[in-house]
Structures are given as structure tokens and as C-alpha cells.
Amino acid sequence: MSSGKKFKIVFNAPVVLGFSAICCIALLLSRLTLGVSDKLIFSVYRSSLADILTYFRFIGHIFGHANLEHLVGNLTMILVLGPMLEEKYGSKDLIFVIVATAIVTGLVNFIFFSNVALMGASGVVFAFILLSSMTGFRSREIPMTFIIVAVVYLGGQIYDGLFIKDNVSQLTHIVGGLVGSILGYIGADK
């Protein structure tokens, strides 16, 4: 009855799995510290440049999430898209995409929104969405799927930003998508 073939669990996308684990730990820390860890490390907001934690927050904000629903929403997309991207571009390049997205979205929030604390991986999600639609990109060709994804996702965020008032940072989604698109274009030869 047994064919002798055994299945094993593989650690197929270490960056994506590590990122996801850090996000889960950040949410747990937030609950254990009653949100103090979010204020210290896992959200970015206008603060003194003399405060060393300000610089950690430019990256740390992507790990913090307001609640379990926020975390699950972001990690679902990251765990669906991330392994494919990590396989195509490699772990180092995917870390670069994540860190670049964190820094750019953190700086945009820091500079332009003095009274807003930003947290969550949605900028990374949008970077992954647009980057994944660029995986078939060849020099001097733009995939139709990229155009459709850009119009649907970025257009939707522009619409939401103009007409819907909520606690979602559509600008972070747009900036994350732009980072993913630009890095996808630059890395098209891989």
C-alpha cells in the first residue's frame, strides 16, 4: 500500500516566512505591551530626528498591525505572492524590495502627514502585487496584465483616497505599488 515516497515540509521562502513571523511577533508584542511597542518601533510618525528609534520606525512600521484582521489581510497576500517572487528574484532582491518599500512609505508618511501614525505591511503587499504582474516583463514590452493590475489596484486606491474617508493609507498602497513597479522594471532582465 505504501509506495515508499514520503512527503516533507520545506522552508521554501525564508524571507517571506521570516517576514510573516516577525509581523506575528510584533502583533503579540503589541498586545503584551498594550500598544507601547507599536509606538516605540512598529509605527512611523513625525518625531524628532534626534530620537534613534525614529530611524528604526522607518522600517519597523511594516511589521506592526492594528489588529488580527489587519495582519491576516496583509499576510494572506504576502504568503500567496511572496514565495513566487522570492523564487524568481531571490531572497536578497526580495529583502531589498521590502526594505525599499518600508523606507519610501515611511519617509512619505513622516514628511507629509505630521499627525498620522502609519503601520502595516500593505505597502509591501501592493509592491508585491505590482512586482508580480511584472514577472513576464521583457525589455521594450509591457505585459497587459501589468496594465490591468495597475489600473484596478492603483486606480481603486486613488478613488478610495478621493472619495472614501477611512483609516486606510491609500497613499501608502500607491507608493508601495510604484516601488514594486519600478523595481520590477529595473530587475526585468533577471
Language-model regions: role of each:
Residues M1-K190:
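A detector for small-residue-rich transmembrane helices and their helix-helix packing motifs
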